[in-house]
Amino acid sequence: MVFKPKSTPLYLSGLFFFHNSKRFLRTISTHCSAKYDEENDRNHEIRNQQHHLYLYKSKGQHLLTNTRILDAIIRRSNIGPTDTVLEIGPGTGNLTVKLLEAAEKVVAVEIDARMVDVLHKRVADIGLQDRLHVICKDAMKAEFPQFDLVVANIPYGISSPLIGKLVYGGNPFRSATLLLQKEFARRLLAKPGDSEFNRLAVNVKLVADVEFVMDVSKREFLPCPKVDSSVVIIRPKNEIPDINLNEWCAFTRTCFSKKNKTLGATFKQKKKVMQLLKLTETTSLMRENALTGHNHECDEYYDGNNEEENTNGEDSFASSTSDLELNLFKEKIVGILKKGGFEDKRPSKLSNEELLHLLSLFNQAGIYFHDHVKPNNANVDFAAAYVS
């Protein structure tokens, strides 16, 4: 029986750290792409002590090796000499060393301690270690320090939640130049009416503008991935709509659960009507308590702190709600859709302005989509929403 290595070996020699390594790396990349299967890279032994390490495709470890493309990314990022740049997933530092030459400081977040060791050595060899700060941690769990720009070849597996963390994270920055999976980038760039248009684009474009820069062939990476990539630039907007972000995320989740169904069909479902009725009564009770100064607990089915109680509460709410009450509430929802001209429209063809208008119509009528009993955490909610 013949065993294949479960990851791609990358030999770290003096060649790797200099410009003349480009041809060497491309040769290895071509060889590896033909020899190794991405699906067999899960639990292979790491052998750092022999001056080589393994790159795990399952962890998104694909190193961009084309100097021309790296230089283009630096140019389009518009890095100033006083800027602090955040880089997610620096790997062995191909992009990092160029960022250090252009910026005052680079904060690199890398989860793989092996890569951190290589990165420190490489930066020390060119005498720029004073400009580099490395955080060896999962980027989704790390607390980012203040930064001006993001420039990164991010692991594809965390693209959605990471972008959510950046644009909704509360850290102001000028732009994020990101190398993403091509298909994902197309979804991010999609416009209403495009087949790729989705909730991802809607949520990002609420707070940021997205610009396409260029496509990058999969052959420019080591090891070679199965798909091509694209570079995009995300620029946060100076002004964003004054809305509750949790409410917006819950609303778009409802609308895009079946993006090609009409809104009338989506909102007429009995389960959805009951859910919105419950949330509406929760919000009304909370506002009544705020106005009267009462601070008593809501009924058990409004308590989001105990999962078991909350489940029992949903059953209690359903059993205590009459068909007449549900039908009246359903008619109210349909009336709002008809009033705004949305009943026969599909989410996949609506602009953000139209979606914001529809949400305002619902809220003005006292209908809400977010459970206001639960603690507000727009960042977590938004990041998690990308995955679905």
Describe the residue ranges of each PLM region.
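Catalytic cores of RNA-modifying enzymes
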Residues: V2-T254, H357, L361, F369-H370, ...
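C-terminal target-recognition/interaction regions appended to catalytic cores
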Residues: K4, A34-R47, N260, K270-Q275, ...
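Substrate-binding/catalytic lobe of Class I Rossmann-like enzymes that use SAM or dcSAM, i.e.
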Residues: V202-E325, E331-K332
